Amino acid sequence: MGTSALPGLDRLLEVCGRLGLQQSVLPPGKHPPEPFAPVAGTPLDPALASFYSRMGKAILAADADGLVIFQVDDGINQLEAENNALRAGWQGDYFAPLFVFGGRPLLAHYFATVPNWSDPSGFQPVVRVDTYERPYALPIASTVDRLFDTYSHYLEELVAHEDFNADGAAALSFPWKVPHLLARDERLVQLIREGSFDALMTDADARAWSGEVLNAHSRL
């Protein structure tokens, strides 16, 4: 089965290069996972399969904010290991409907797809999960590649922010301070309106923030 193009990833790599941000990328394995192949009991999102056909792992913009995509190659399957570990842990019930594929460097923040809400082509929406104390999620993209695209625009705004040199990512935290960027994602907005993520947004601030995304969309 063929893999799909990833224009969002291409833009993210271009932005990192243009802004002089760190990029650490490992080559793909000889036998990358196919779209919809079972990984930790979950069909692999086709955009993630496309990513792993190009790279075995990526750490992008760690000197600004940081996006890590877990390692999968001929020697390591971090997707399998991380998802199995999280589902077996004390927060396992929360992670059961999610498929974690990355996170932020050195923080208990994960990026995960929500397989139950995949679109007709099988592409899964993405949430950011905060696991400090009681876990909660923020819906951030309709697909994995849309996350890459949105994150690339976020990095441009972050680096241009007047407080970036002094405060780093705290000057414009992702995704809390950029609901206007997520509001451009029409399918994400539709899923939020339909209540698809309500069970995952266990935090009152998360629910209020999702309302900010909807308000930002109404102003487009």
Model-derived features with residue positions:
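A surface-exposed partner-binding patch
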Residues: 1-112, 182, 187-188, 194-220
